[in-house]
Amino acid sequence: MKKIIKSLIILIAVFNANSVFAQQDSLSVKNLDEVIVTGQYKPQTLKKSVYQVRVINKDRIKQSGATNVQQVLNNQLGFRFSNDNTIGTTDVQLMGMSGRNVKILLDGVPMIDRGDTRESLGQVDINTIERIEIVEGPMSVSYGSDALAGVINIITKKSTKDELSVTAKVQEETAGKEYHLFNYKGVHQQNININYKKNNWGFTTGGTHNDLNGFGGDAYGRDKDWLPKEQWMGNAKISYDKGPLNVYYRIDGLNETITSRNPINYSNNIAIDQRYITDRFMHQLQGSYTFSKKLQLATTLGYADYKRRTKTTRHDFEKNTDELTTGDGEQDLSKFNSFVFRTTLQYQLSNKISLQPGIDINREAASGQRISNNPVITDYAVFISTEIKPNSKINIRPGLRFIKNSVYDAPPVIPSINSKIALSKQLDLRLAYAYGFRSPALRELYFYFVDANHNIVGNPNLKAENSNSFNGSLNWTTLPKNNMAYSISLAGFYNTFNNQIDFALSSPTSNQYTYFNVNKAKTLGGTLENRFSRKDLAATLGFSYIGFYRKLYDEKDYVKEDDKEFLWSPELNASISYNLSKLKTKFNLFYKFTGKRPQLVTGKNASNQPVLLIAETDAYHLADFTSNTQINKYIAVSAGVKNIFDVTNISNNAVASNSIHNAGYNVAIGYGRSYFIGLNFQWNKK
């Protein structure tokens, strides 16, 4: 495997003898000035932003052949995904921090999750995405809770031309070696979108069907390693844009069914099946009005409705009948809803000073058999930031957020300061400090699940987690010349986290688990990213090295077998894209090496003493090769190989003792090498 890494590095070096680097993930010279909106007063280029932002544009998404957002992010530096194949869910990690510290936005509106696992990231229709903007580091002044590690803002497509456009897509993919045309085995996706814009009005609607038929299992298609997952997604949008007024309403809907078919009990020919059924609706009404060149108003209203049902049935193979089971927790319905109101005013006092005051109100409610007392939490916040430009080279942006929460003790004031200094036309320095916080999830506050095998309750006295974050970056970019561009980004960060919420026994003599503000943690690391593009060729190379430190609340009760403070893990990624203009074909190779991930776990030594051990998850390599060919004006074909190294599971030499869903010593990564082919149709009429 080391030879593979060296070969990739040498190959990129041939294309780019100067080994140059970049901060965004697009494969085009013109995209060095990509326009972004996340955390900005108004849309502006990456180069002008005070934040360090990564952008994954629609071309990169198309080139990947991905059927969900996780597949797009999986080869990005700092992103790792953990799969819980017991219940069919996936969570994200960003720069060493878990998904509960990452804010997921859809067009700037927070997406709701039932707990601290970011399942919502896999419940967005990838065919509607224009680009993904990633801001690393706390964004709590602008976006409130959960944005300790950063923000992932998914920007959907918008109609820009007066025309009628119809797009359709069918993609067939194997799951490892398993495949059957259109159903039964493999991965199948169908999509259709219709866009219409006339004068000031725009209308968009579309739908997608995703069908993963699982992977592995016995001869009867049961007891699968990867659970079957079927998704139906739909969306509609109507917009009006005239002069200073821009307003739109959008609705997104999802129905998802994850099926767990357990092995047959041959003594009575009966099997137990479970289905996890999710229904999600997300409404957003957004508008902006420009009073003058110096004064703009933007307002967002959002409402999300989320339901998740557990349905357990007893299937009798002799009678071919199904009946609902009656065991504790085997039939469950949990409901969550959220309301968001956000308004901001952008005012330019002068060429050197701009202000952005704002109001942010968030309300969350939950109910269900495992949620006690039908809780409601409301968060009220006002915030203000200002951009100060003493000259054309310096931009300083301090900000404050003031919070009042109806349930828990939130930090009363959240400060941040970001700065950008243009050291030259090609060299930019960014420095930042931010205080971040994460509010307790409803599940952590009010969860209640007691049966013969579980005794878990929430803790309504939890406090908000908080963090102090310091980060900086140095970005150098050449001026594009002769269709050639070079850029380099060197970034570093240091974060401390306090009052981290964790799952533990309520007392040493009890068998009841609950949540406490118990842990402290730190992350320290750096990234080096590179880009080279010339005519039809583009290449990227990146490296990260991130250290993690975690102090357990009961650490004094354990013997430490290693005095290391930080546990380190490396990553390396690379990509090459070449466009054969005459054949109207683009070839793409994406690669990522994920190094060993050490972690602190509890156990016992040879003397039966409780000890803190360092466990390691094995390193692994992922690579995809894809091609995109434009057959004619209307039809394009995409094809390729994913997971070239055929990675399915990696080893973990220890498992934490308080894992709720313990799948053993293997960590699921993927369902092996897979092949795909997709047919894309597009028709436009002015």
Regions found by a protein language model. Give the residues of each.
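Short, acidic, small-residue-rich periplasmic hinge/interaction motif at the N-terminus
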Residues: Q23-K62, G99
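Extracytoplasmic beta-strand/coil segments of soluble accessory domains associated
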Residues: Q70-V109
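Short acidic/polar hinge/loop motifs at secondary-structure boundaries
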Residues: P110-G137
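Outer-membrane beta-barrel translocator/receptor signature
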Residues: G115, T128-E130, V141-N153, K158-D218, ...
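Outer-membrane beta-barrel signature, preferentially recognizing the C-terminal barrel domain
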Residues: V135, I272-T290, S334, Y408, ...
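Gram-negative outer-membrane beta-barrel transporters
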Residues: T167, Q356, N391, A485-T496, ...
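Flexible loop and strand-edge segments within Gram-negative outer membrane beta-barrel domains
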Residues: L212-L297, Y303-N337, N662
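C-terminal beta-signal and adjacent terminal beta-strands/loops
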Residues: R438, F593-K604, N628-K686
